[in-house]
């Protein structure tokens, strides 16, 4: 039996890794061929996505980031009650990287990125220490490490010193039943769905928007994702957190997705936008170039003029970018990801 340990999940706090994990579980429930059991924390008793499950009441209830850290510390100090609950698993998978509880069975860890090592200046000393302790140690202890892109694989092998044969690339999928083209008219706005972390590069995007509006004064920029606390320039609309249905609607109505991030392990919004028929302009960082696969217009992330020029190119050639994007997005499915994960599990059985 394959155990999937989600004990460190606090719903709504883990961003893209939570969405990716739920997508994988849903696909395993639909098309999986192995027996599964999901081990859930009391804070997320419904996160099994249709697979058999146990809620481990021995794990401390956690509804916030601080409570999550406390629960993790207690589980690390006193792992035996949790280990007993997982003893029937032949292989244990930790989709949120941290091996809690540690077990004697072979383990698979999903490592979404190594941003704390690649861009350490963006993290506090405490956060760097936490990630180095739990992420690095968990990856080194696992029999297999799964990453979403070749970029993260190279970083993992280089920075953590792992044997390349232990690290497998399995790209994320998307729900094509939800992320699909609609009949909406395209409107004169650009979409950037990203929480306002420093590496998301909002300030440079604002500079590019000012340049764009000299030539296309009707253009607006719509932001989603939360975290926006500073004032924004004219032409910027801050939506904050939006529902999945609202996000799909925005993808279907936006003239283009613009994604100027300085760092990504995968870049899920790029694929989601393409699947909705939204043309994409994104930064030329390795993970986004890899994921876009030539179907997006790329630019240097810190060059406002280059961002503006890329957006104008996408707007002028929208039909071409739309078709290329739809073709590229079709290759990213959770069913394919689930099949590759099952290949990894079988290696350890």
Predicted feature descriptions by range:
Residues 1-349:
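Carbohydrate transferase catalytic cores enriched for Leloir-type hexosyltransferases
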């Amino acid at each position: 039996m394959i155990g999937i340990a989600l004990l460190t999940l606090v719903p709504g706090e883990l961003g893209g890794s939570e969405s990716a994990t739920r997508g994988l579980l849903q696909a395993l429930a639909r098309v999986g061929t192995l027996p599964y059991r999901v081990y859930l924390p009391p804070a997320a008793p419904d996160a099994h996505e249709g697979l058999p499950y146990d809620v481990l009441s021995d794990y401390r209830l956690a509804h916030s980031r601080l409570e999550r850290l406390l629960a993790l510390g207690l589980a690390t100090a006193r792992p035996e009650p949790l280990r007993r609950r997982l003893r029937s698993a032949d292989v244990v998978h930790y989709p949120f990287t941290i091996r809690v509880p540690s077990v004697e069975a072979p383990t698979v860890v999903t490592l979404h990125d190594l941003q704390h090592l690649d861009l350490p200046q963006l993290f506090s000393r405490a956060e760097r220490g936490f990630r180095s302790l739990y992420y690095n140690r968990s990856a080194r202890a696992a029999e297999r490490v799964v990453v979403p892109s070749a970029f993260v694989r190279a970083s993992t092998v280089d920075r953590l010193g792992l044997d390349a044969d232990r690290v497998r690339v399995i790209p994320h999928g998307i729900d094509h039943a939800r992320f699909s083209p609609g009949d909406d008219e395209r409107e004169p706005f650009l979409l950037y769905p990203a929480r306002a972390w420093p590496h998301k590069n909002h300030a440079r995007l604002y500079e590019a928007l000012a340049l764009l509006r000299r030539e296309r004064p009707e253009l607006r920029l719509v932001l989603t994702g939360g975290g926006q606390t500073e004032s924004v320039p004219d032409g910027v609309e801050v939506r904050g957190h939006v529902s999945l249905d609202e996000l799909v609607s925005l993808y279907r109505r936006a003239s283009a997705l613009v994604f100027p991030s300085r760092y990504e392990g995968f870049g899920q919004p790029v694929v989601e936008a393409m699947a909705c028929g939204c043309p994409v302009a994104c930064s030329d960082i390795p993970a986004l170039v890899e994921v876009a696969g030539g179907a997006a217009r790329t630019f240097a992330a810190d060059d406002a003029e280059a961002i503006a020029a890329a957006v104008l190119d996408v707007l002028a050639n929208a039909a071409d970018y739309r078709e290329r994007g739809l073709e590229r997005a079709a290759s990213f499915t959770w069913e394919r990801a689930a099949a590759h994960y099952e290949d990894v599990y079988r290696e350890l059985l």
